[in-house]
């Protein structure tokens, strides 16, 4: 038995992971993994809530798991697994669906934003996305969930469902579901688009030039940075509200180089965009090189990668099935006598 607090998090395999996923999420997991019991999921069930390529889903799932490890996640101390491989996620999701008032769901900001993009193709799955996320979290009795500000509302929903709709209604002397607390990931959580410094970097952006993917070649990185939006000011600034692109690139540069933003701002106060972009490009290529090298070793050894995912699944399944069994028992489901 471990006395470590438990953490649960994950990323969708909807496309290549980018530097926003790395700096804003995975890097934080790397820092947390030594002191916490860590479960990291590739959330492929979430990936099908919008249109997707069936030929790419499996490939992207394996690639995402490989990138977790290439970025520093240690499979010897973390359980890395694929969401759809554990049926308890879908089963608990349905139970939570039946316990959650629909007006709670209608308040979800992200659905409103994403449904505008989807138009008439918006699915029930996208509407139900926060319930599946709640099931993901609650299945593992997570103490903490690392989230960005944009996911905080979804975590609050998970807490409300657990406390008000399950524990308060069906719990007797003890809670049925553990109430998780957020770890708000501030460092790197606001990596913005290369084309628009006011818009978050996203895998779903149709413009490939809006992001640097972790597997981009040096040639592609160079081209994307050259085309990245700039402004007419001289020198690089971080706190000027009229210069979101300058702020964004300085933030990324700071995280990659390990230098304080204030130091960079001082060093680059008289540096033009052309010169800065060359320096910035070199830093990105240098920072991504070891990740890309480790990734190639992993992806070219599918047997070892599958072994890691099987081990992760086995550990995760024990915890998930125990929680699901407890929920079903307390909610009155029939159980076959053994």
UniProtKB/Swiss-Prot annotation:
Primary location class: cytoplasm
Domain of life per record: Bacteria
Pfam families given in the database record: tRNA-synt_1b (PF00579)
SUPFAM superfamilies for the chain: Nucleotidylyl transferase
One of the protein's GO biological processes: tryptophanyl-tRNA aminoacylation
EC number, as in UniProt: 6.1.1.2
GO molecular function, one term: ATP binding
UniProt-listed PANTHER family: TRYPTOPHAN--TRNA LIGASE, MITOCHONDRIAL (PTHR43766:SF1)
Function: Catalyzes the attachment of tryptophan to tRNA(Trp).
UniProt protein name: Tryptophan--tRNA ligase
Record organism: Prochlorococcus marinus subsp. pastoris (strain CCMP1986 / NIES-2087 / MED4)
Lineage of source species: Bacteria, Bacillati, Cyanobacteriota, Cyanophyceae, Synechococcales
